[in-house]
Amino acid sequence: MIILGVDPGLTRCGVGVIEAGAYRRLSFIHVDVVRSDPKTSQDLRLLAIYNGLVEKIERFAPDAVSIERVFAQENRNTVLGTAQAAGLAMLAAAQRGIPVALHTPTESKLAITGNGKAEKIQMERMVARILGLNTLPKPADAADALAIAICHALRPAGALQGGEREQHLTAAQRQWAQASQKAARRQGVRRGM
């Protein structure tokens, strides 16, 4: 399975591509940063990011696209640009019928290091170790994109979009999801919802 990970950003959008083989064996394929010029207008910046993402998707033909979930940041302009870039990645994948998954930074840290509060350097070292890289992936956006792809390989059920979730779950994950749904329904009945 080829997984394309995206660390969304309006100035720098990290893209990492890995292959998940049998027995969770992960292999490095590609890492890059799609850039836009902060001096140009917003629409042209978005177009540059979109075109770069489309080029990567068409070049590597991933089976899944995994995107870092946008969360609130103090700088409103930063979160807006990040959300727009994430939307472009979702659009580019959806137009090609590729399943999209969203993973939080905490999920990614937990899947890769076992610690949801791992420092960036710990993440970079583990990404390099997992993928057998001799050097740490740089810049940080590139390392984060690889981390998101690895997270999806290790935790494929993470917030899949477009109703594709069930086909990517293991039997145990399906049973857990069904039990969780039943428990939620029972709680809803007890609360009179």
Swiss-Prot record:
Gene Ontology terms describing biological process: DNA recombination; DNA repair
Recall the GO molecular function terms of this protein's record. Answer: crossover junction DNA endonuclease activity; DNA binding; magnesium ion binding
Q: Does the keyword Phosphoprotein apply?
A: no
- Which reaction is recorded as catalysed by this protein? Endonucleolytic cleavage at a junction such as a reciprocal single-stranded crossover between two homologous DNA duplexes (Holliday junction)
Quote the cofactor binding remark: Binds 2 Mg(2+) ion per subunit.
Enzyme Commission number: 3.1.21.10
Q: What InterPro entries does UniProt report for this protein, alphabetically?
A: RNaseH-like_sf (IPR012337), RNaseH_sf (IPR036397), X-over_junc_endoDNase_Mg_BS (IPR020563), X-over_junc_endoDNase_RuvC (IPR002176)
Source taxon at top rank: Bacteria
Cofactor(s) named in the record:
Mg(2+)
The main location class comes to cytoplasm
Positions of the catalytic residues: D7, E68, D141
Q: Under which name does UniProt file this protein?
A: Crossover junction endodeoxyribonuclease RuvC
Q: Which UniProt keywords are given for this protein, alphabetically ordered? A: Cytoplasm, DNA damage, DNA recombination, DNA repair, DNA-binding, Endonuclease, Hydrolase, Magnesium, Metal-binding, Nuclease
**GO cellular component annotations of the record:** cytoplasm; Holliday junction resolvase complex
